Amino acid sequence: MGSVSAKKGVIVLVPYCLQGHMTPMLQLASILHSKGFSIIVAHTKFSSPNPSDHPEFIFHALPDKLNGFDTSFMNLLNVMEAINSSCGGPLVDYLVEIMKDKGQVISCIIHDAIMYFAEAVASQLNLPSMVLRTSNVAFMESHRDILRLHSENRFPLPDSELENPVPGLDPLRFKDLPVSVSSRIHDKIIEFFESYMNIRSNAAIIWNTTQVLEKYALNKLHHHYKVPSFAVGPFHKMVPASSSATSYINEDRGCIEWLDKQAPNSVLYMSLGSLSTIDEKELEETAWGLANSDQPFLWVIRPSSVNGSGWIEHLPEGFQEMVGDRGLLVKWAPQKEVLAHPAVGGFWSHCGWNSTLESICEAVPMICRPCFSDQIVNSRYITHVWKVGLELEQPSDRRVVEKTIRRLMVADSEEKEMRQRMLDLKTQIESSVQKGGSSYNSLNDLVKFIASFP
C-alpha cells in the first residue's frame, strides 16, 4: 500500500468485481483523477484489477471470504451477498488507518450500486457517499416496477400478459423485465433488488449515461429520488487519452491487422461480452447462419463461453473450411478499437451497457442477442427507441441468423436509415462531451459537488 498526495481531495472508489462493472468504475477514476482528485480503489481480492495498469491510483484489496466459494455465474447472487456481508469491517479498518495514522482527508466514497455495504461504512465514519450506476436509467426503472409488481402479489404473471407493455416503461413489455416474471421470484432476489435500489444516505447518483439517450428517464428519476443525478457518460469518451486499458482478458491485437485488409463497413463484429454463455446448439446455428450469409466477420468466442466447451471444439465440422479467410476467430478483442475501425459495419452484441455505448459512439448498428439482466432492457431500447439495431428473434435458427445478418450488412433503404440514425446519435454524443455539452457540464457540476463536501 502506498500513500496519496491529496490535491483537491482523496476519493475512495469501491467497484464490483466483474469486468462490466470494474471498467466504468476505473474509467470514472481516471476522469476524476484528471480533475485533480487523488484516487484509492478498494476492491475485492476476487477478480481484482491489475494495479500496474493504473500506477496513478492506490489499490487496496479487501478480504472477501470468497476463497473456495462457488463464484460461477449461476451463484452470482450469493457472491454479491457474501461480499456485502464480509467487506464492510475491513473497509472501515483500512479507512480509519489512512485517516488517523496517515492523516489523509477523504472527500467521499463512491461505490458501485451492488457494493451497498460501502454506504454503511461511509455513514459509520461520517463520510459523504455517492453511488455509481453502471447500467442505464431504464434498467433501474425496470427494477422499480418489479418491486411494485411483487408488492401487489402479481407474480407469476400469466402468459397472456407477457407481451403487454409495462405501464410507464414503454416500449418494455413484461417479458422484457430483467427477471422471469412468469414464475415466482425468490425472496432473496427481491431482497437484493431492494438493497440495490435503495440509495439510503447517498448524497448523489452518478450515471454512465447521457441526456442524449436518456433525458426523459433522468428527469423522471430525479423527481423520484430527490438527490442530484450526474449523467457524465459515456465514460469512455470522457476519459483522458493517456488512460490505461481496463480489460481483465488478454486482447488479441492481431485482429486489427486482419481488419486493415477488409473493405469499409464490410465486417460483422461478434461478441457476447465477458460473462454471457450460449449452448452448443446455438453455436452451431450461429456458425451456419454466419457461413451462409457470405459476410466477412470477426467473431469473439471467449474460452468457456460455450457450455461444455473449452473454446471452439464444438464449432460444426466444415465451418472453418467453408468460411476460409472471410472470417477470423479470436478469444478476445480490443473492442473499442475494433468498433472504431472503418472496416466494421455491424456489431452482433449481447447488449451490455458498456458495449451499447461503445457501439453507438462509433455509429455501428447492432444485431441484438441479449442473454440476461440489463441486456434485455438495453436490447429493447436499441431496437424500439433509438432504432439503431435489429432484434435476433430466433438465435438457434440458422435461417433467421443468416437473414438478420444480411438485413443489417447489405445496404438497402432500411439499413441506410439505421446508419443515419446512428450517425446522428454519434454526433450528438460527441457534442455532449465537449465544452458546453450536457455531459461536460454535468462532470463540472460533479467536481464542484465533491469539492463542496466539508
Curated annotation (Swiss-Prot):
Documented EC number(s): 2.4.1.-
Biological process annotations from GO: (-)-secologanin biosynthetic process
GO molecular function list: quercetin 3-O-glucosyltransferase activity; quercetin 7-O-glucosyltransferase activity; UDP-glucosyltransferase activity
SUPFAM superfamilies attached to this UniProt entry: UDP-Glycosyltransferase/glycogen phosphorylase (SSF53756)
Gene3D superfamilies given in the database record: Glycogen Phosphorylase B (3.40.50.2000)
PANTHER family: GLUCOSYL/GLUCURONOSYL TRANSFERASES, UDP-GLYCOSYLTRANSFERASE 76F1-RELATED
UniProt record similarity statement: Belongs to the UDP-glycosyltransferase family.
Protein role: Iridoid glucosyltransferase acting on a broad range of substrates, including both 7-deoxyloganetic acid and 7-deoxyloganetin, curcumin, genistein, luteolin and kaempferol.
Protein name per Swiss-Prot or TrEMBL: UDP-glucose iridoid glucosyltransferase
Taxonomic source organism: Catharanthus roseus (Madagascar periwinkle)
Origin organism lineage: Eukaryota, Viridiplantae, Streptophyta, Embryophyta, Tracheophyta
